Regions:
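Cyclophilin-like peptidyl-prolyl cis-trans isomerases
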Residues: 21-24, 383, 387-391, 398-633
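Bacterial Sec-dependent signal peptides at the C-terminal "C-region" and cleavage site
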Residues: 16-36
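Structural detector for internal amphipathic alpha-helices that build alpha-solenoid repeat scaffolds
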Residues: 31-52, 60, 68-82, 87-91, ...
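N-terminal secretory signal peptides that target proteins for export/translocation
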Residues: 1-2
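Acidic carboxylate motifs that coordinate Ca2+ or other divalent cations, activating on Asp/Glu
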Residues: 97, 195, 293
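Bacterial N-terminal signal peptides
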Residues: 7-19
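Amphipathic alpha-helical scaffolding segments comprising HEAT/armadillo-like alpha-solenoid repeats
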Residues: 24-28, 50-63, 82-94, 113-126, ...
Length: 633
């Protein structure tokens, strides 16, 4: 017998955020009721079994007498993503306690086994609790089957659940590539729904890569919907991405309009991706260099790079670089473009103006010099290898060594490189790279006694010691210290002072205890201080936390488990970066600019921006964390 439905639509924002949450400056907690984890030994045991990936031990707790334990065990199994746990989880969809049913639905969705489709659909038809229903709807979106699309399209939902339906169908088609005409037609029709939250949820499908082939032949309806939108409508950000992927000349004017006039910076940045710098859109891209949003400017500069620009634009690019000495990410793109245009003197003058010890500027300088051949660039790389900054000197010496690997076929270059390596051999920060260069067979006949250098002072740079064994930063990375977490509390904050301002992150201890412990420990020990945002993709995310190499390639010597949580990847959510698979997280994390549903099954969401989202929207590559402070809460 069908149960009467209870609850309020507010749970949808917590579960999906598929509506007005998109533009919110901060988010509520995940919506999962507190279960007293930090003071409950039985619940802590479940978490520890999860970290050990003891599937049998966790499954056994699904039969526990206490509903809190059953629920915690169900949620923990989500991070295993093990299909063999589906048989044990499915009966919990009919548990007497709503929290257990909710966490079981969440886990089945994150596991994503298509065999769960029928059970989820049947549970949705009978479920009364609003929170459980929202998780059932979301879980169906991860089933990657046409049957899941059929169930979502035919489900008898309340009006306030329509955004959840559109969101899950968008995920089915856009993330998993489920080809279903009914799904496509529903989402196209819903693009012009009067409710902006439903419109936004449906539009996300058209911005996801896997969905393009399903709707490309019906693009006329997408264009009509976009043309009907107000310039402030956030749904446009997804449609302009989809149309940009089609690369159809019919859309060039349309994309130019949104790139120049959209009120949401994310829409303007997305529209830039579809503009061709070889055509009439070049003026739109050039004009965007004056956009008030730094990330729109960055997107425009990236679009300009590589284009055959007219030489008349050179003075404009020069003026921009000169007038924005601290906008290094954009300057990097424009300097690369100038190098490609053979404006060598301009680029070298910028490099020559780099002050000794300016690590951030040298990062750009060394990259830009890679586009310039010959002695002029090599002499400047050698200068960087003698910089007071150990990090700059070590990196420059490695850059010089890599250049040698590419130039060694040219006999004319041998004398130059030999002299450069010989000059650097006595500098302990550059001596490893210099020695490797001098040991090249091309220099075997030269009179130079490398053996005599054995008594040279021991090198101290990162480049020298990185091959030596060292203790991991967190030797007990897979062990939870519950006393430490109780000291942090259920809602601690991580306050990031950045080069653009203050960002405060609220952390979700109860759902991602190991992750919160890891990040808090690293912050308390000062490891995040001075670390740059090495990767920023406009309207996707800003990533930081490489405490070793600072460029995204560093590995701190430990990994931690993935902890999938019920916090959705909406704008302002903080997630752990990984090495491309579950259970490979370490120190790096990212903050999202907008909804990113494709991250749900592979990344730990462990906090959100409680204040300072306006600062996050200013962050560019090479901006940095000046300090990171943990505040218990």
């Amino acid at each position: 017998m069908r149960r009467p439905r209870l609850g309020l639509a507010v749970v949808l924002c917590a579960t999906f955020g598929a509506a007005g949450c998109e533009a919110a400056p901060s988010l509520p907690s995940s919506g999962r009721p507190a279960d007293g984890l930090l003071d409950d030994a039985e619940l802590q045991t479940v978490v520890e079994l999860g970290i050990q990936r003891d599937i049998d031990g966790v499954v056994e707790r699904l039969l526990a007498e206490r509903p809190e334990v059953r629920a915690r065990a169900a949620m923990t199994l989500a991070s295993f993503q093990a299909a063999e746990s589906v048989v044990a989880l499915s009966p919990l969809l009919d548990d007497a306690e709503a929290q257990v049913r909710r966490d079981a639905a969440f886990a089945l969705g994150r596991i994503g086994d298509p065999g769960s489709t029928g059970a989820l659909g049947a549970a949705l038809a009978e479920e009364a609790d609003a929170g459980v229903r929202s998780h059932l709807i979301e879980a169906l979106g991860h089933m990657a089957t046409e049957r899941a699309a059929d169930l979502l399209l035919s489900a008898d939902l309340e009006s306030w659940e329509e955004a959840a339906r559109a969101s899950s169908l968008s995920v089915l088609g856009g993330v998993y590539g489920v080809s279903h005409e009914g799904l496509r037609d529903y989402l196209i029709e819903t693009l012009t729904h009067e409710d902006p939250s439903i419109r936004l949820a449906a539009s996300s499908f058209f911005g996801l890569q896997s969905g393009v082939r399903l709707w490309a032949r019906h693009a006329i309806y997408v264009r009509q919907a976009l043309d009907s939108y107000d310039l402030a409508d956030p749904a446009a950000m997804h449609l302009v991405v989809g149309l940009a992927r089609l690369d159809d000349f019919l859309d060039y004017g349309r994309l130019s309009r949104w790139a120049a006039q959209a009120q949401d910076w994310r829409t303007r940045a997305n529209a830039m991706s579809g503009l061709n710098p070889l055509g009439s859109a070049v003026q739109v891209l050039v004009d965007a260099l004056a956009d008030p949003s730094p990330l729109v400017v960055f997107a425009a500069a990236r679009a300009l790079t590589g284009g055959a620009l007219d030489d008349s634009l050179v003075p404009l690019l020069e003026r921009w670089i000169e007038g924005h000495p601290n906008r290094l990410a954009v300057s990097r793109e424009l300097l690369i473009q100038l190098a490609l245009m053979r404006q060598i003197d301009v680029v070298l003058a910028w490099v020559d103006a780099t002050a000794p010890g300016d690590e951030r500027r040298w990062v750009v300088g060394l990259e830009v010099l890679s586009y310039i051949p010959g002695q002029e660039s090599l002499s400047r790389i050698a200068r960087a290898a003698r910089d007071p900054s150990e990090r700059t000197a070590a990196e420059a010496s490695l850059v010089l060594l890599r250049r040698w690997q590419g130039d060694r076929q040219s006999a004319e270059a041998h004398d130059l490189y030999f002299d450069l390596f010989r000059e650097l051999i006595d500098d302990p920060r550059a001596s490893v790279a210099a020695r490797q260069g001098l040991e090249s067979p091309e220099f075997a006949v030269r009179s130079f006694d490398l053996a005599a250098l054995g008594a040279t002072s021991a090198p101290t740079s990162e480049a020298q010691v990185k091959d030596e064994p060292s203790l991991p930063l967190l030797p007990d990375a897979q062990t939870i210290d519950w006393g430490f977490l109780r000291g942090l509390g259920n809602a601690p904050s991580l306050v990031l002072e950045t080069t653009r301002g203050t960002v405060t992150l609220q952390l979700l201890t109860a759902e991602a205890p190991l992750t919160v412990q890891t990040v808090a420990r690293l912050a308390l020990d000062g490891h995040y201080d001075g670390v740059p945002f090495h990767r920023v993709l406009p309207n996707f995310m800003a990533q930081t936390g490489d405490i070793v190499a600072r460029d995204g390639t560093g590995e701190p010597g430990f990994t931690i488990r993935t902890e999938l949580t019920q916090l959705p990847f909406e704008a302002g959510v903080v997630g752990m970066a990984n090495l491309g698979s579950l259970d490979s997280e370490n120190s790096q994390f990212f903050i999202t600019h907008s909804r990113q549903p494709h991250l749900a099954r592979g990344f730990t969401a462990f906090g959100w921006v409680s204040s300072g989202m306006d600062v996050v929207d200013l962050l560019e590559p090479l901006d940095a964390i000046l300090s990171a402070t943990v505040v218990p809460g």
